[in-house]
Amino acid sequence: MESWLIPAAPVTVVEEIKKSRFITMLAHTDGVEAAKAFVESVRAEHPDARHHCVAWVAGAPDDSQQLGFSDDGEPAGTAGKPMLAQLMGSGVGEITAVVVRYYGGILLGTGGLVKAYGGGVNQALRQLTTQRKTPLTEYTLQCEYHQLTGIEALLGQCDGKIINSDYQAFVLLRVALPAAKVAEFSAKLADFSRGSLQLLAIEE
């Protein structure tokens, strides 16, 4: 994906169902480790809750390698899975949902739990504000000092930026560009430098 929506700010929704209190929290989490860290922070904040059920889409919305969920002691399939289904249906990436349940003494049944956990995430998603994320690819570029201002201007025109500059006899730049803008920037760079400058891919 060239770009996707991510949460712009955290959301918390509180709901009481048959004396059980459900607190649904959504947050931006860039990667699985960030998702796990958010879950742990919620656990620390609500240590006395009976359940801390979890779902995350930790990468791009279509990245199945970064999905996760946990029922945390609720009957299998009644919490994490319906929560994840709501997240996946939203089209938002880099997002984690935690639903904290304080048990009120009345059993909700399988259908009731699915509705409570999935419904909590659905309500929170309706309140969520998002922003668009465009991932950038990094390249190196070597130029003369007098060319630097021109290159900065070209990067600005193509939604790119300079990540790092190393000043020696020449300037070695590490730049980042959206994938969709690389060809345009390369063409402008060739025109600007009369073919003397080119982007070099960074080898992993």
UniProtKB/Swiss-Prot annotation:
Pfam families: DUF1949, UPF0029
PROSITE patterns, alphabetized: UPF0029 (PS00910)
InterPro entries xrefs: EFG_III/V (IPR035647), Impact (IPR023582), Impact_N (IPR001498), Impact_N_sf (IPR036956), Impact_YigZ-like (IPR015796), Ribosomal_Su5_D2-typ_SF (IPR020568), UPF0029_Impact_C (IPR015269), UPF0029_Impact_CS (IPR020569)
GO terms for cellular component: cytoplasm
Superkingdom of the source species: Bacteria
One Gene Ontology MF term: guanyl ribonucleotide binding
BP terms from Gene Ontology: regulation of translational initiation
Family from the record: Belongs to the IMPACT family.
PANTHER family assigned to the protein according to its UniProt record, in alphabetical order: IMPACT FAMILY MEMBER YIGZ (PTHR16301:SF20), IMPACT-RELATED (PTHR16301)
Quaternary assembly: Monomer.
Protein name: IMPACT family member YigZ
Source species: Escherichia coli (strain K12)
